Amino acid sequence: MIKPVLKMGDPCLLQPARRVDQFGTPELEALLQDMQDTMAALNGAGLAAPQIGVSLQVVIFGVEHSPRYPDAESVPFTVLINPVLTPLTEQMEEDWEGCLSIPGMRGLVPRYTRLRYQGVDAAGASIDRTVTGFHARVVQHECDHLNGILYPMRINDLRKFGYTDTLFPGQTIADD
C-alpha cells in the first residue's frame, strides 16, 4: 500500500529508529511491501521506514536506468535492516541530493566515496557489501534517516541548497 511520506519538520524524522528484533513476521513483510509500493510510486532511489512514520531500522534502495538519475550507475534493489556503515576512506565527494521528505529542493552534500555496509535482509540473512560512488551515496543518505538526520544537516555551504527549479532553471528534475 502506498503510504504518505513525512516531510521535513515532522518530529518523527528527527528520532533515532529502533532495531528490528524479529524477522519473517507479517508486520515486517507488510512494512517492506508498503515501502516498496511507496518508493515505486514516487520513483525514489530509496526509502527509510521513518519516512513513512515507522521508527524501525529498515531501508530499501535501488536504481536501474532511472530518467531521474540518467548519469548514475545502477544500484541493485536491496532491503537492508539494522545497518552498520563503515567508511573505508577519508575521501569525501560533494554531489547534489534530493529527498522524498524534502520535495522540490536539492543540496550539495558531502559523502564518503567508499564504504562497507553490513546488516540483514528481510529473512534475517547477513548482508556485507563494499561499495563506491552513487551506490555509497544512496546507502549513506537512506541510513542517515535511521539516525534522525536529513541531508540539509550535512550541507557545508547553504548557498548550495535551494529549490530545484531555481538551482537548475529550465531542467526537468523530479522530486526525490
From Swiss-Prot:
Q: What is its EC number?
A: 3.5.1.88
Q: Which residues form the active site?
A: E142
Source species of the chain: Nitrosomonas europaea (strain ATCC 19718 / CIP 103999 / KCTC 2705 / NBRC 14298)
Q: Which residue spans adopt a coiled-coil conformation according to this UniProt entry?
A: none
The alphabetized UniProt keywords are: Hydrolase, Iron, Metal-binding, Protein biosynthesis
Identify which cofactors the protein needs according to its UniProt entry. Fe(2+)
Q: Name one Pfam family in it.
A: Pep_deformylase
| Record family assignment | Belongs to the polypeptide deformylase family.
Q: What does this protein do?
A: Removes the formyl group from the N-terminal Met of newly synthesized proteins. Requires at least a dipeptide for an efficient rate of reaction. N-terminal L-methionine is a prerequisite for activity but the enzyme has broad specificity at other positions.
Which Gene Ontology molecular-function terms are recorded?
metal ion binding; peptide deformylase activity
Details of cofactor binding: Binds 1 Fe(2+) ion.
InterPro entries (UniProt xref)? Peptide_deformylase (IPR023635), Peptide_deformylase_sf (IPR036821)
What reaction is this protein's catalytic activity? N-terminal N-formyl-L-methionyl-[peptide] + H2O = N-terminal L-methionyl-[peptide] + formate
> CDD domains, from UniProt?
Pep_deformylase
- What name does UniProt use for this protein? Peptide deformylase 1
Q: Show the SUPFAM superfamilies listed in the entry.
A: Peptide deformylase
Binding-site positions, Fe cation:
C99, H141, H145
* Any GO BP annotation: translation
